[in-house]
């Protein structure tokens, strides 16, 4: 791959993004249809999806160990997988926008949520959870948060999001991040 150049790298990245999108959509659909499924069916489908995420994680690990030029581009996708597996983020839509590095779409979603809260279309608990996820994703993407957003995040960030943020900041190399994600995958399977 390295000898051929950017075309193959681009195609590989596109394929991995498409697989990640499919799995994130599958998680989102699963959450939306949770009421229609019995508990065993829900858990089995979720387990299968997490296993597929684990397989993508393993593929990314192999790619990153063999081709360091992919590290920067794939690290965002890997962090998104880590977040999904560790369940720091509960909203697949947020995970998808984070993986694709789409801060503008995240901010648009935040504005929509503010509106939905005002008109009573969105409950306070769900609003708080999703706003914390979006603000954390924006921060991880290097976006500047307002003082109000920082205060909201400090007051409402849960342990899982704090741990995700700490780990993703502390780990510099892709190998360490992958090692942690692999650990989280194994933990999620148990």
Swiss-Prot record:
Identify the stretch annotated as signal peptide in this record: none
Q: Name one GO molecular function term.
A: beta-catenin binding
The source's domain of life comes to Eukaryota
Keyword list (alphabetical) reads:
Coiled coil
Query: Coiled-coil stretches, from where to where?
Result: 6-64
Q: Please report a single Pfam family linked to this protein.
A: ICAT
| Keyword Transcription regulation attributed | no
Q: How does it assemble?
A: Does not interact with CTNNB1.
- Family assignment? Belongs to the CTNNBIP1 family.
**Entry protein name:** Protein LZIC
* Gene of this entry: LZIC
């Amino acid at each position: 791959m390295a000898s051929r150049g950017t075309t193959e790298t681009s195609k590989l990245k596109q394929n991995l993004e498409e697989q990640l999108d499919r799995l994130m959509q599958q998680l989102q659909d699963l959450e939306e249809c949770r009421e229609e499924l019995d508990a065993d069916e829900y858990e089995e489908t979720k387990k299968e999806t997490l296993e597929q995420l684990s397989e993508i994680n393993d593929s990314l690990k192999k790619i990153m160990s063999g081709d360091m030029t992919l590290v920067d581009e794939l690290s965002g996708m890997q962090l998104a997988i880590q977040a999904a597996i560790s369940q720091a983020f509960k909203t697949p839509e947020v995970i998808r926008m984070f993986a694709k590095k789409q801060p503008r779409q995240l901010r648009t979603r935040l504005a929509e949520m503010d509106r939905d809260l005002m008109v009573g279309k969105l409950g306070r608990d769900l609003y708080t959870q999703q706003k914390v996820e979006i603000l954390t994703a924006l921060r991880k993407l290097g976006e500047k948060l307002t003082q109000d957003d920082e205060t909201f995040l400090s007051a409402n960030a849960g342990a899982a999001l704090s741990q995700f943020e700490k780990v993703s900041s502390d780990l510099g190399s892709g190998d360490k991040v992958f090692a942690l994600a692999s650990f989280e995958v194994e933990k999620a399977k148990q």
